[in-house]
Swiss-Prot record:
One of its GO terms (cellular component) is viral capsid. Interacts with host protein HFI22. Belongs to the tombusvirus/aureusvirus movement protein p22 family. Phosphorylated. GO terms for molecular function: RNA binding. Transports viral genome to neighboring plant cells directly through plasmosdesmata, without any budding. The movement protein allows efficient cell to cell propagation, by bypassing the host cell wall barrier. This is Movement protein. Disulfide bonds: none annotated. Keywords: Host membrane, Host-virus interaction, Membrane, Phosphoprotein, RNA-binding, Transport, Viral movement protein. GO terms for biological process: transport of virus in host, cell to cell. It is found in: Host membrane. Pfam families: TBSV_P22 (PF03558).
Length: 189
């Protein structure tokens, strides 16, 4: 699983961290235990001086899943976030079963906790209950993940937020219908 990380140079309170998993991401049936960290372990060591004594707050998650197989293939699965800071490996969030043959955009306002800068960001994501008619080794989809984080002096918790799931073709249909309605009302006026 190839992972590329890109840092945008901005002040800490506006720092965006982008993780891009390109077409080389392999998601195979029977290999659901592959997990990807939201932040590389070496990132915090590079900026340790500017981070001493604070907490990282994570918000505005945006995940885009682009299928590399036909919609008719019947590929599906659930995306989850997991905390690996202890042996329990608590699952933080999990989606309903997604149709992975369609382009999907998932968003979440925030994670409901902050993480100490001394410990890194022990959050990983992966897939479970994958269903696919393809043999192992077939590339099923690519994923891009964007999230915003900043620094906080205090540890805090927020109410748990939920994933918002939007299938791109459904959103386009709604947009076309709203444009048609708008043009009809404009012509009748």
């Amino acid at each position: 699983m190839d992972t590329e990380y890109e840092q945008v140079n901005k002040p800490w309170n506006e720092l965006y961290k982008e993780t891009m998993l390109g077409n080389k991401l392999m998601v195979n049936v029977g290999m659901e235990d592959q997990e990807v960290p939201l932040l590389p372990s070496n990132f915090l060591t590079k900026v340790r001086v500017g981070l001493s004594g604070g907490y990282i707050t994570m918000r505005r998650f945006r995940i885009k899943i682009i299928p590399l197989v036909s919609r008719k293939a019947g590929v599906s699965g659930k995306l989850y976030l997991r905390d690996i800071s202890d042996t329990k490996g608590q699952k933080l969030h999990c989606t309903e079963s997604l149709d992975l043959g369609r382009e999907i955009r998932l968003t979440m306002q925030h994670l409901d906790f902050s993480v100490s800068t001394r410990s890194g960001v022990p959050i990983v994501f992966g897939f479970e209950e994958l269903v696919s008619p393809f043999l192992e080794g077939r590339e099923l989809f690519s994923i891009s993940v964007k999230w915003q984080f900043g620094l906080s002096k205090n540890c805090y918790s927020l109410p748990q937020s939920k994933w918002k799931v939007m299938y791109l073709e459904d959103a386009l249909k709604v947009l076309k219908l709203s444009k048609k309605k708008a043009s009809k009302t404009d012509s009748s006026v």
